[in-house]
């Protein structure tokens, strides 16, 4: 059979497997590629091809991740799977692999375990919007009541971390049976096919960057005689059109101005779109009113804040991080988008110190406001050297 060409027309959705070690995340990942390729076409990937995940560097942090893809009739899925627990922590905090939804794999034989809980918590902290559950190894459980008990435990756990536990879809099956092409009692290929159909139905199509409200981090500011002030940067999302009002947010008080021109490679354009590097000409704005680290945004869509709770991964010594722990009162720089802002760290109750290689929840108070929203990623730096990575989990003020 001739290979089908890759259909760009289908919407693209990013997913990933999460859950406790040895509950079957990688087996399920392999089974997903196998079942989809048989039912709907595409490439099947063997277990070994996923398990020996290549290491990649994201913001100087070494993460082992496997990427596979599969297709349903209506979507193209890009799926990430990590070999070790530490890789999940780094992956989710740095946002190296942003997930539109996660597949929580939980062994029906063991029930929820410590990493099951930790991955659900991380998903909540870093803003993974949807979780679908695959209750794996169900062929090893003869007792129907035991299955129901495990299902209830998983639902409780999801509810504890503000996911809709009662309404979360749970598919019961065996990834191994599916991988071997078996389907005893509908636990194998049927269950995995049902999982994909559930992903299609339960995870909404993600909004594309271009459809979101305009935002551009300011990288540079120029004054052009006779024309005014130009700010440059890469449009993060949305579209800015000539004649539209924009806000300058962060560091100082928020101000409003109008975009009077957009240029790219010295050519004048009507608009700047997500992903493009552009210069935006601002009406009546003085060179000193704007600085790197602020953002240009559609009015009313983003606000400046100084105090927030974050989930942080501290680089290990091998990753070029600190060689020693830090304690409460630690004051590093927090690098948001294009600039560093000093901030004080408050550690959770009962945590005296944080070691390199740890992940920790901490409250940060910045000395200057930054345009932020939940889910914004940042780096922690000391004198220009990255020592940590984090994500804004909750904004306080």
From Swiss-Prot:
Residues covered by region (G1): 19-26
- Cellular compartments per GO CC: cytosol
Localization:
Cytoplasm
Give the catalytic activity: GTP + H2O = GDP + phosphate + H(+)
- Listed as disulfide-bonded, the cysteine pairs are none
What is this enzyme's EC?
Answer: 3.6.5.3
Residues the entry annotates as binding GTP:
19-26, 81-85, 136-139
Taxonomic superkingdom: Bacteria
The annotated region (G4) lies at 136-139
Residue numbers spanned by region G2: 60-64
Q: What are the start and end residues of every segment in region (G5)?
A: 174-176
Query: Which GO molecular function annotation, any one, does this entry have?
Result: translation elongation factor activity
Q: Which UniProt keywords apply?
A: Cytoplasm, Elongation factor, GTP-binding, Hydrolase, Magnesium, Metal-binding, Nucleotide-binding, Protein biosynthesis
Sites where the protein binds Mg(2+): 26
Q: Where is this region: G3?
A: 81-84
In this protein, which residues make up the domain named tr-type G?
Answer: 10-207
Which SUPFAM superfamilies would you find in this protein's record? EF-Tu/eEF-1alpha/eIF2-gamma C-terminal domain, P-loop containing nucleoside triphosphate hydrolases, Translation proteins
Q: What does this protein do?
A: GTP hydrolase that promotes the GTP-dependent binding of aminoacyl-tRNA to the A-site of ribosomes during protein biosynthesis.
Subunit (UniProt): Monomer.
Q: Which NCBIfam families does the UniProt entry name for this protein?
A: EF-Tu, PRK00049.1, PRK12735.1, PRK12736.1, small_GTP
Q: Spell out the protein name for this chain.
A: Elongation factor Tu
Organism (species)? Hahella chejuensis (strain KCTC 2396)
Ranked from the top, the taxonomy reads: Bacteria, Pseudomonadati, Pseudomonadota, Gammaproteobacteria, Oceanospirillales
